[in-house]
Amino acid sequence: MRYYNYLTTPSGKTCNLYELKNKDYIILLKFLNGENFEGFYKKLNSLIVESIPNFFELDIIDKAYLYVAYFYYSIKTSINIKAEKFDAVEVPLTILLDSLEENYNKNILDYKFYKWDDCKVSYPSRIILKDNNIDIDYTSGLKEISEHKLTTEEVRYISENAPLYDLNQLENFITNNFSQEIYVAKNIMGIKDIKDNMINPSLFYSIAYIYKDSLEHYYNLLYLVCHYIRVQWESLLEMTPVEMMILYNNFIEDKEAQNKKHSKNKTLNLNDPNVADMMMG
């Protein structure tokens, strides 16, 4: 089941924002890892066109708003269910190590752990990108794409000023920083000056910047679900982020219920006179 959010764009148009699948976000992440921001934009653009029939009627601010909304509603919301911060998805060390011991496969996995404290770890984030089907989709998207390069100053400005998680600021940010004027010669079909908002390399980067760090952690979350809960990878790819997190949360709730039941049974056994006599020797 694909969930959707009913969204009103800055221009007042309404649409149903259907979730992308996990495999779609992984393909987007591959473009970002290669710093191919135009490829990222074109892939995201094609995915949104499929789910929003009137996409081509939207202006650039509405489109950019939708790009960020996909991130905001699917990735940010999913990660925040169990982790308020974006710096990591955390799990207890003992649980993770037990899971890794059961699932370790030297042919495809290369584990490298970074211990933060006594009970938290981070885990690798380059495992799943080797999936063959995803590679085919990714490389086919590269054929007609040429990369745009930004200056160091442009990158610095965007990284310091882009409204990463605030949809309310996005319209002003795009309007103020990325508007361009197109002047068409008056003798061409009698058209006078045209003013429009154009998509340029800086806009590719600003949208990509919003996705990049959180997609890395979202990728780690996929790894956690796949190997901790032991969901088949093919099934996980076809899920959406919300479906994945529902599965994960149900698993956690079941685990907690089992632990409480085990703890309760252990307490009851200690109150058993026979058990007490045995303990006293």
Name these PLM-found stretches:
Residues M1-K264, G281:
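An amphipathic, hydrophobic-aromatic interaction surface with interspersed Lys/Arg
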Residues S263-G281:
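Short acidic DE-rich linear segments
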